[in-house]
């Protein structure tokens, strides 16, 4: 959830390195990506905590290639992510994929120049992203998506840790005290809408990227995940744009987001 992923797709001189580490067998498939000639420039995009992202350039055409992390410990459902991504692309909320490998080892999409959500977003920015999240929550990409169980997800992450660790013991105790959010309100949620996963293009449109952790869940979790990443002086303003029917459960949602994030971090600090 919050801060678990960071895969910015805007490129500056400090965020790329000219490194060729994409496997040759993948680069050999460039014709499948709709290119007329093999790539002449490959730039590694820094920032991804889960996957590896590359800017591919061929005769002025810019693509983004993402090598997917296949570790099962991440709790990622790649086939679901693909279905959700394709649905969201049709809805105009995320960039369209040009190609994905049969094993979902990697996929390629158009590179969209832009910037991530600012560290101190404006009121208009905050209103715009809450509107996008509301659209996301109204989507139904497929009928058999898994449902996020916060307690189960936290327990799965902590099972990868030293069970005798004081931090793990304390966190397990906090998890047992969680109050579930109303199950009847569950809908499609992104579940990782932190600032780095928002891209504002040159026309001012916001795109929402990286749907790895998307699942059926309570919509307040999406708003909480983003809210916790905003400066404190922006959090109250952001909450004013959240649908009124969710505001009573926002404190609970923030607690759940924090616990899931801490569990994930403990697992990946020791795993």
Residue map of PLM features:
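An alpha-helical support segment within catalytic cores of ATP-dependent transferases
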Residues: 19-38, 139-191, 196, 202-203, ...
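ATP-binding pocket architecture of kinase catalytic cores
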Residues: 44-145, 183
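Active-site Asp-x-Gly
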Residues: 75, 187-188, 201-252
């Amino acid at each position: 959830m919050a801060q678990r992923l960071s895969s910015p797709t805007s490129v500056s001189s400090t965020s790329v390195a000219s490194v060729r580490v994409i496997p040759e067998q993948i680069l050999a498939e460039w014709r499948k990506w709709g290119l007329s000639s093999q790539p002449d420039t490959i730039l590694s995009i820094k920032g991804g905590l889960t996957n590896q992202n590359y800017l591919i350039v061929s005769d002025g055409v810019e693509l983004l290639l993402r090598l997917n992390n296949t570790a099962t410990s991440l709790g990622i459902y790649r086939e679901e992510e693909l279905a959700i991504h394709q649905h969201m692309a049709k809805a105009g909320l995320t960039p369209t994929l040009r190609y994905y490998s049969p094993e979902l080892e990697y996929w390629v999409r158009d590179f969209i120049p832009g910037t991530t959500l600012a560290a101190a977003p404006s009121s208009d920015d905050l209103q715009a992203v809450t509107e996008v999240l509301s659209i996301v929550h109204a989507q139904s990409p497929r009928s058999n998506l898994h449902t996020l169980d916060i307690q189960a997800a936290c327990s799965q992450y902590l099972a990868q840790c030293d069970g005798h660790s004081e931090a793990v013991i304390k966190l397990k105790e906090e998890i047992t005290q969680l109050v579930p959010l109303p199950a009847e309100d569950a809908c499609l949620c992104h579940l990782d809408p932190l600032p780095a996963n928002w891209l504002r293009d040159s026309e001012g449109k916001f795109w929402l990227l990286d749907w790895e952790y998307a699942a059926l869940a309570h919509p307040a979790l999406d708003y909480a995940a983003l809210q916790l990443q905003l400066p404190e002086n922006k959090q109250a303003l952001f909450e004013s744009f959240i649908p009124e029917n969710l505001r009573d459960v926002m404190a609970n949602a923030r607690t759940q987001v924090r616990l899931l994030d801490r569990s994930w971090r403990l697992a990946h600090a020791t795993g």
